[in-house]
């Protein structure tokens, strides 16, 4: 039986798990979440649902950067 807590199947289809990529690239929460949803797109939930989740976190990050730069 697969370990659904530490190594869920929808993240373990290649040699790289999203958590390892997120850590290696030093991504923040928003960008890390986007990577996570892109990586599992179509493997856990519907691909469009997963990609829309990724898009939402990218939009959150863009808003945060714009706010930081005084554009909002």
In which residue ranges do the predicted regions lie?
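Intrinsically disordered, low-complexity regulatory regions
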Residues: 1-72
């Amino acid at each position: 039986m697969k370990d659904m807590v530490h190594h869920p199947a929808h993240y373990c289809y290649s040699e790289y798990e999203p958590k390892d990529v997120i850590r290696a690239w030093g991504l923040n929460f928003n960008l890390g979440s986007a990577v996570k949803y892109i990586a599992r797109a179509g493997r856990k939930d519907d691909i469009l649902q997963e990609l829309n989740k990724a898009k939402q976190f990218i939009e959150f990050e863009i808003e945060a950067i714009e706010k930081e730069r005084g554009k909002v």
